[in-house]
């Protein structure tokens, strides 16, 4: 079972201003306690070096550390888990490789994707999107919007599917209240944090919105 940390996830991204490590550090300083290292097309050795640094940072903050796509790397460094896209290793195969103690998340874009995934495996959470257009993702799937999430959540309830659904893709702070009202269990962010004038403050403000009862400490 995954922790309440999954309600707010940060996905690393490289920009002209910030390295992958910078982005993870700022998210952690802002109070986020779930970091997914996403380094598409990166050199394997560079990704491992980066993962080890960010994993140590996550441990210092008591945060969950997820590796995107790279199952063997997640196992090698004993990350908390792995997130798998629709074209990555099948979840069932990853579960065999990692065992039951690792968190495994899967990408879906529709309720049909959820049903197809559950035919062969049960992930710990679904990353579902995109909510809006996002420049951080290539080959973007059809945009869901609020109504798309409402429909998926309704269908999941009707089928008694109780797996956390995390909204992702172009999410900014102003959209969060209505997104949560749509029924998603959490959100994942990247660009909206990194494009802010003060990324740490932006994350801090969102953490306060998501976890009103939790005091944020550095």
List the predicted regions and their residue ranges:
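A short acidic, glycine-rich active-site loop
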Residues: 137-139
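Conserved N-terminal beta1-alpha1 strand-loop-helix module at the mouth
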Residues: 1-89, 97-124, 141, 147, ...
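Short beta-strands and strand-loop turn motifs
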Residues: 34-38, 127-135, 187-190
């Amino acid at each position: 079972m995954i922790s309440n940390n999954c309600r707010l996830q940060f996905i690393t991204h490289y920009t002209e201003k910030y390295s992958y490590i910078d982005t993870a550090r700022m998210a952690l300083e802002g109070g986020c306690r779930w970091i997914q290292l996403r380094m598409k097309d990166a050199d394997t050795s560079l990704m491992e070096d980066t993962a080890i640094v960010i994993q140590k940072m996550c441990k210092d903050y008591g945060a969950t550390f997820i590796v995107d796509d790279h199952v063997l790397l997640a196992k090698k460094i004993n990350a908390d888990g792995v997130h798998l896209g629709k074209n990555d290793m099948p979840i069932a195969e990853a579960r065999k490789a990692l065992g039951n103690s690792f968190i495994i998340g899967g990408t879906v874009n529709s309720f049909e994707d959820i049903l197809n995934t559950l035919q062969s495996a049960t992930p710990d959470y679904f990353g579902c999107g995109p909510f809006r257009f996002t420049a951080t993702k290539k080959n973007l799937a059809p945009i869901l919007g609020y109504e798309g999430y409402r429909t998926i959540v309704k269908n999941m309830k009707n089928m008694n599917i109780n797996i956390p659904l995390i909204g992702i893709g172009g999410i900014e702070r102003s959209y969060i209240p209505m997104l949560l009202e749509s029924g998603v269990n959490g959100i994942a962010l990247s660009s909206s944090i990194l494009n802010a004038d003060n990324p740490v403050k932006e994350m801090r403000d969102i953490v306060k919105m998501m976890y009103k009862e939790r005091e944020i400490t550095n």
